[in-house]
Curated annotation (Swiss-Prot):
Lineage: Bacteria, Pseudomonadati, Pseudomonadota, Gammaproteobacteria, Enterobacterales
HAMAP family: IspD (MF_00108)
Catalytic activity, reaction form: 2-C-methyl-D-erythritol 4-phosphate + CTP + H(+) = 4-CDP-2-C-methyl-D-erythritol + diphosphate
Name of the gene this protein is made from: ispD
PANTHER family noted in UniProt: 2-C-METHYL-D-ERYTHRITOL 4-PHOSPHATE CYTIDYLYLTRANSFERASE, CHLOROPLASTIC
Name of this protein: 2-C-methyl-D-erythritol 4-phosphate cytidylyltransferase
Cross-referenced SUPFAM superfamilies: Nucleotide-diphospho-sugar transferases
């Protein structure tokens, strides 16, 4: 992909960081390559993105040692490009953003960042999130936002020894999900600044927060789970069977 020209402002590029090794899965295989219902997790994730009419292209950021992605059927899809990632997730996202900044031909485009291990994304969630770009076009100066779900359970803050320190008020607490959706150049600049100053960046929104922005929380489905632990596989398979 030497030059990705977007046909209109409605076209969206997705960025999927997939350079992690998934140590919590207790598996020899990175979690994005584990199989659910005959397809790898990352293939389910890519299908959820590429089946949406507004997503024109997906950039996947891979570990330098990755040898498995090239064996998947989806590798032949012309709408997919791969780039090499960095040591941490934030480094990989920045590598993808730097690549996109050189090939989009559009300084005003927006980018959708989505976890490789979140295969259960629904298009109704995605539609609500993509409305943020429309708000920006209408002059509302949206800086972007993320899918998130309100915290439902009682939250406890612990201390050393796994002892309860106190109960945290759950009002206004949200679980941050993906996709997270921002203007490409704004996200790149914020992430670059935050990393250069050794800030603790755990998702894309935290880079914007570090630079003084306040992204929007877009209410998303709680079944948009990230496959992190072995028990998540059966749950993801159940959710996918009901899509």
């Amino acid at each position: 992909m030497n030059n990705l020209l977007l046909r209109s402002s409605a076209d969206i590029i997705a960025l999927v960081p997939a350079a992690g090794i998934g140590s919590r899965m207790n598996s020899d295989c990175p979690k994005q390559y584990l199989s659910i219902a005959g397809k790898t997790i990352i293939e389910h994730t890519l299908s959820a993105l590429l089946d949406h009419p507004r997503i024109r292209h997906v950039v996947i950021v891979l570990n330098p040692t990755d040898t498995q992605f090239q064996s998947l059927e989806v590798v032949s899809d012309s709408r997919i490009t791969t780039v090499t990632g960095g040591e941490q997730r934030a480094d990989s996202v920045l590598a993808g953003l730097n690549h996109l900044a050189h090939v989009t031909g559009n300084d005003n485009c927006w980018v959708l960042v989505h976890d490789a291990a979140r295969p259960c994304l629904h298009h109704d969630d995605l539609d609500r999130l993509l409305q943020l770009a429309e708000a920006d076009e209408q002059g509302n100066m949206a800086c972007g936002g993320i899918l998130a779900s309100p915290v439902r359970d009682t939250m406890k803050r612990g201390r050393v020894g796994q002892i309860i320190d106190h109960t945290v008020e759950r009002q206004d607490l949200w679980h941050a999900l993906t996709p997270q959706f921002f203007p490409l150049m704004l996200l790149r600049d914020c992430l670059s600044k935050a990393l250069s100053q050794h800030a603790n960046i755990t998702d894309e929104a935290s880079a914007l927060e570090y630079c003084g922005y306040q992204p929007v929380l877009v209410n998303g489905r709680s079944d948009n789970i990230k496959v992190t632990c072995p028990e998540d596989l059966a749950l993801a398979e159940f959710y996918l069977s009901r899509k």
